[in-house]
C-alpha cells in the first residue's frame, strides 16, 4: 500500500479543521428553547455550574442545570430578545457584582447596575455573589451591641454585631418598619447598611428610599432592589448580591448590617426557577435544597477575628474585627410559624422577633410579642446600662400577660395582683414607639429606670408617653452632663444613679406630672 503525500496533507488538513470546530463547540452553544426566562442550550460542554453566559444583544444568564446533552440556564433581565437558534458563549466567570464604598447612597439592581437615575457607579472592584462563609476558626463570639433604637428590642431582644436575628410576622405587622428604624439608628455609628428588597412593589421600595433620605441614612446605605416586576432569577439572586456588597466591609475590619426584605419571596422565586428547570418538587412544591438556599446565605453573616481581617487585607488592616449583622424578614400566613420556610429560617438564625397582628391592631406598635421573641446570643452583647435596667421588664410583661387573661373572669383581685396588672399596663404603654424615631442609649436607660423604680406607677396610663417625653426634655435642659456621661460610658454608676433619681423626683414634684 502506497501513501500519496497529497492524500496525507488533505487528511491532516481535515483533522485540523475538525479540531478547531470541536474546540469552538465546547465554549459556544445554541439556544434550543426559551420559556419564562429559562433557556435550554445545546453544545456548551465546558460550562461551569453558576457560570455567566453571554447571549446576543448584551444579555447575560446563569447556568444552573448541567445535563448530559443540554444546559438549563436562567436569563438575567429581559428574556424577550432571546430566541431559538441564538448563539450563546461561556464567559469563564462566575456571576459577579461591583463592590466598594462607591455604592453607598445608591439604588442598584441584582447585577449592581444603578437604577436611581444618578449616573453610573465609579467602582473598579467586583466580587462573586456565591462565596463560602467564614470557617469556625475565623470567627469571634458576638460581644458588641448593635443598637436598633427600638425600646422593646434593645431591652428584651438585644442584637449583637455579627448576629442573625429573624423578624417574622404576618403581612402589615410592621416588619419593614423595624428594619428601617434599625438602619436609621446606625447614623454616626460607623455601620454600613445594605437593604435588599426582594419581590416588593416598586412604589414600596421608593417609599423606603425616600424615608432613608429624609433621615440622612442613605449616605451610609446601599439599596439592592429586585422588584416584583423583575424576573424570578433576579429576585432569587438579589440576596446573594447584597450579601457580597456587605461582606466587602466585613472583610476589611468594618461593621455592616444587611436587611433581607423578605426571604419568603426569595424562596418563592427560587421555587419558580426550580420548577421551570424541572427539578423534582418536595414539601409545599419547594425543591429539596431550599434549606441550603437560606443557610448558605445567612451563614455569611458573622463576626470575624483580627487574624482573618489581617490575612484578607494582606496586613493593611491590623487589630480590627469585622462584622456583618443580618436581619432576615419572613412573612407568615395567619401566624403559622410552623410552615416550611419559617421553621427553616428560625433554625438557622440566632433568635427571632415575632410581630403579631392582634397587638398591631390593638395599637401596640412595634407589635412585638415578648413571650416568644428571643435573642440567643445578643445578651452577651447588650449594653451594660440597658442590661442592668431591663431585667425586670420581660418578667413584668410576662406576668401581666398571664394575669390579664385571668383578670377578665375575676371580679375581685387582691392588691398584689392589681399592682402587677397596673405595672404591666404601664410597661406595655412605655414600649410603644412612633416610627422613624429610634432612641439613643441614654433615652432608653431613663425610660427603663423610671418604670423599674415605680416612678410611673401613679401616672395615668394614657399619659405615659407624654410623661416620658417631658422627662427627657427636662433632663436635656437641666442635666445635660449626666445624659452625656450615660451615652459615652454606656454605664450607670452609683453617683449617676443618685443624680438621675433626684432629677426624676424633682421633675415629678415641679413638672407638669
Swiss-Prot record:
Cell inner membrane keyword on record: yes
Annotated residues for binding of ATP: 169-176
GO cellular component annotations of the record: plasma membrane; proton-transporting ATP synthase complex
EC numbers on record: 7.1.2.2
Any Pfam family the entry gives: ATP-synt_ab
Disulfide bond entries: none
Classification via CDD domains: ATP-synt_F1_alpha_C (cd18113), ATP-synt_F1_alpha_N (cd18116), F1-ATPase_alpha_CD (cd01132)
Membrane topology according to the record: Peripheral membrane protein
Site note Required for activity, residues: 373
Catalytic activity: ATP + H2O + 4 H(+)(in) = ADP + phosphate + 5 H(+)(out)
SUPFAM superfamilies assigned to the protein according to its UniProt record, in alphabetical order: C-terminal domain of alpha and beta subunits of F1 ATP synthase, N-terminal domain of alpha and beta subunits of F1 ATP synthase, P-loop containing nucleoside triphosphate hydrolases
Gene Ontology MF terms: ADP binding; ATP binding; proton-transporting ATP synthase activity, rotational mechanism
Record key words, sorted: ATP synthesis, ATP-binding, Cell inner membrane, Cell membrane, CF(1), Hydrogen ion transport, Ion transport, Membrane, Nucleotide-binding, Translocase, Transport
Protein's cellular compartments: Cell inner membrane
Entry-linked NCBIfam families: atpA, PRK13343.1
Family: Belongs to the ATPase alpha/beta chains family.
Subunit organization: F-type ATPases have 2 components, CF(1) - the catalytic core - and CF(0) - the membrane proton channel. CF(1) has five subunits: alpha(3), beta(3), gamma(1), delta(1), epsilon(1). CF(0) has three main subunits: a(1), b(2) and c(9-12). The alpha and beta chains form an alternating ring which encloses part of the gamma chain. CF(1) is attached to CF(0) by a central stalk formed by the gamma and epsilon chains, while a peripheral stalk is formed by the delta and b chains.
Protein function: Produces ATP from ADP in the presence of a proton gradient across the membrane. The alpha chain is a regulatory subunit.
HAMAP family: ATP_synth_alpha_bact
Protein name: ATP synthase subunit alpha
Lineage of the organism: Bacteria, Pseudomonadati, Pseudomonadota, Betaproteobacteria, Burkholderiales
Gene behind this protein: atpA
